[in-house]
Amino acid sequence: MTETFAFQAEINQLMSLIINTFYSNKEIFLRDVISNASDACDKIRYQSLTDPSVLGDATRLCVRVVPDKENKTLTVEDNGIGMTKADLVNNLGTIARSGTKAFMEALEAGADMSMIGQFGVGFYSAYLVADRVTVTSKNNSDEVYVWESSAGGTFTITSAPESDMKLPARITLHLKEDQLEYLEARRLKELIKKHSEFIGYDIELMVEKTTEKEVTDEDEEEAKKADEDGEEPKVEEVTEGEEGKKKKTKKVKEVTKEYEVQNKHKPLWTRDPKDVTKEEYAAFYKAISNDWEDPPATKHFSVEGQLEFRAIMFVPKRAPFDMLEPNKKRNNIKLYVRRVFIMDNCEDLCPDWLGFVKGVVDSEDLPLNISRENLQQNKILKVIRKNIVKKCLEMFEEVAENKEDYKQFYEQFGKNIKLGIHEDTANRKKLMELLRFYSTESGEVMTTLKDYVTRMKAEQNSIYYITGDSKKKLESSPFIEQAKRRGFEVLFMTEPYDEYVMQQVKDFEDKKFACLTKEGVHFEESEEEKRQREEEKATCEKLCKTMKEVLGDKVEKVTVSERLSTSPCILVTSEFGWSAHMEQMMRNQALRDSSMAQYMMSKKTMELNPKHPIIKELRRRVEADENDKAVKDLVFLLFDTSLLTSGFQLEDPTYAERINRMIKLGLSLDEEEEEEAVEAAVAETAPAEVTAGTSSMELVD
């Protein structure tokens, strides 16, 4: 007997929306149908814990996918709990779920169709690819019933004989003509791997297997005849003589159908980390990341209590070439809810600086109506994110225990650690412990800030550092001369990110950072050193004043330096302005903010080394005649040279002319000799005069 029912208004509206609106991402229907089958298996499994008889003859729970090209149907079966007649009527038609209206509102707000399963109405996604759906189900407490609808506003319920049922539940999709691609084994395998690989039960796909079989001509003829007549092949006795004759054989192709398990990679995160081998982690990592190399670090953990989720995080061996591109969409951490795949680009699950970490998060608590639109406001997700960051930091600390392993890690992902210091204020202290730098004392091995502090001299009051292009350049920088003389270690910061890091951090373990290229650097001095410094300032006062007048607005001031010991002079920037290295970086940016650059590129201060012979001689000449023309030339030359040695860019093109004049003076050349040399050079390069009788054509030849 067949009964007809009308869909509840909201469900009818939802089905109409699904059928009449074009969605490009129709493939999600299979995910939702398999997910429902998995839920049915979960329910029967829970019941069997108290009543094992509910499983009947079932030895294991599974989900089967059967494509039928001849009838253009795709069937999904499971041996889960099944549905009664009342369940079919209520759950699939007459009682609207809370998610129905919520999902339609989300669609109107711009949500993606792929979120349908998370609103508890995933069953209806079947109508994305099918024009008719049939559900045959058998619950232990009821008979077999068939639910069927073509989404025309009504559905029917019909009783059926139990002999029709192989498994307790079967949903058959009668595919639309333009959706027959979902009958291809290759396409189905792809979708199962993408969306349902970590379902807790075997997903078996019916596939065709072609094998070659060797048969005799007589066997083939008998088989054909039996097929035509519908009779069983005759069995005849064969005498020894007949059997001894050699029969002709040939190979024929035989097509068989069999079930093939598709989700062979079981969800490792549900297992105890102690029971998972390194090889299993590596295989799992390669499956989710498409990487070919084993991960050097793994963190497998679970969080229980008010919030429950499991996760596995991996550090890849190499950084992707486009890792830090701002517009790159990252899909490194896959989000599952109760082992059902939700999304692979959940940007709010992990901060940008951890964009290189790959892994899986499976939550038991995220609501079914989670969507991209409300992920940011979801409190559960924020707690998950906080725990992921915490566990990743623990993983990095574990890697750091082995210096060689951490060296490789830092080469690949040191920039991310520095980006984290810039962005993540809550974890800045822990991230700073992961930093590594070369220094004047470390040689070819990088040092930690913690180790630096333990090596600090008793009279040292700051952590000294210098920024620049390379370690080699910084080792010979004039800025570190006095620090080296006093035995103070200086950190070399050679990456662009270091500049941004030092803008955010001011101290480490109560020791302030001091940039040796900026103003405000003071070393602890004895009373004798202080007295001597005051004398030098007084002695050089007139020289400093004269040099400031000559240089004008090129410098803010000229003072006696505390940081030089062998170089004549340097240029330093203000304490809160850009360093020379930062200024060069900003100049090279195509989209730089000119107004900001003008503000941050503060006036430079020229510092003199009063003990240097050049400065002593210059001071003597100024005191003898402050209007000496040679003094002005020397001051400009010293300034330009200081620009170069301090890491700035030359802006005055006359620098080369001044150098040439200095070379002439060194060679004791006067103006007349120079003019004669120039005239001789011009004469040598001039074309020879055309002799009489030589034609222009001959010259051309």
From Swiss-Prot:
Xref: NCBIfam families: PRK05218.1
Subunit structure: Homodimer.
Keyword Cytoplasm attributed: yes
Family from the record: Belongs to the heat shock protein 90 family.
Keywords, sorted A to Z: ATP-binding, Chaperone, Cytoplasm, Nucleotide-binding, Stress response
The protein's name: Heat shock protein 83
Biased composition, class Basic and acidic residues, residue ranges: 222-245
Taxonomic lineage from the root: Eukaryota, Discoba, Euglenozoa, Kinetoplastea, Metakinetoplastina
Protein source organism: Leishmania amazonensis
Keyword Iron: no
